């Protein structure tokens, strides 16, 4: 199970990567392994506002449909359209090819409230 140290993590198994004044968001390796084979990804539109702890999209696997929860507040500035045709990227490359959205945060300090890799690893061990 991969948990890159440079990322921050939410309790809902999303990861956040800071890139200048924007953040890239996706789901963790742990989340994709729990979901099984991903067959469909539904994401917001560019320009949509997302609110922390509220759904911004969903992933559908052969087992279930799971909502994606926003780890921070902000405005969607980019969406990974490759996932529309290749949802399997979520299983194959959750931290690289399968990023979900890029967001301009309303308040970048919210990122500091998310878990470090070590804290996230401790949380998933308890599950």
Swiss-Prot record:
Modified residues annotated as N6-lipoyllysine in this record: 63
Protein name per the record: Glycine cleavage system H protein
GO cellular component, one term: glycine cleavage complex
Protein purpose: The glycine cleavage system catalyzes the degradation of glycine. The H protein shuttles the methylamine group of glycine from the P protein to the T protein.
Protein's organism: Bacillus licheniformis (strain ATCC 14580 / DSM 13 / JCM 2505 / CCUG 7422 / NBRC 12200 / NCIMB 9375 / NCTC 10341 / NRRL NRS-1264 / Gibson 46)
Cofactor: binding details: Binds 1 lipoyl cofactor covalently.
Complex formation: The glycine cleavage system is composed of four proteins: P, T, L and H.
Domain of life: Bacteria
Keyword Ribosomal protein among UniProt keywords: no
PANTHER family: GLYCINE CLEAVAGE SYSTEM H PROTEIN, GLYCINE CLEAVAGE SYSTEM H PROTEIN-RELATED
Keywords tagged on the record: Lipoyl
Domain spans labelled Lipoyl-binding: 22-104
Pfam family, one: GCV_H
Spans through the membrane: none
Required co-factors: (R)-lipoate
Keyword Ribosomal protein in record: no
InterPro entries: 2-oxoA_DH_lipoyl-BS, Biotin_lipoyl, GCV_H, GCV_H/Fam206, GCV_H_sub, Single_hybrid_motif
GO biological process: glycine decarboxylation via glycine cleavage system
Family: Belongs to the GcvH family.
């Amino acid at each position: 199970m991969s948990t890159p140290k440079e990322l921050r993590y939410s309790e809902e198994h999303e990861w956040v990567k800071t890139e200048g004044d924007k953040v890239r968001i996706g789901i963790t390796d742990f989340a994709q392994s729990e979901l099984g084979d991903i067959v469909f990804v539904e994401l917001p539109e560019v320009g949509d506002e997302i609110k922390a702890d509220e759904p911004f999209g969903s992933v559908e696997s052969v087992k279930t449909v799971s909502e994606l929860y926003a780890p921070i507040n902000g405005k969607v500035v980019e969406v990974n359209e490759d996932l529309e045709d290749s949802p399997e990227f979520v299983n194959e490359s959750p931290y690289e090819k399968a990023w979900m959205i890029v967001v301009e945060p309303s308040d970048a300090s919210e990122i500091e409230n998310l878990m470090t890799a070590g804290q996230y690893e401790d949380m998933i061990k308890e599950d």
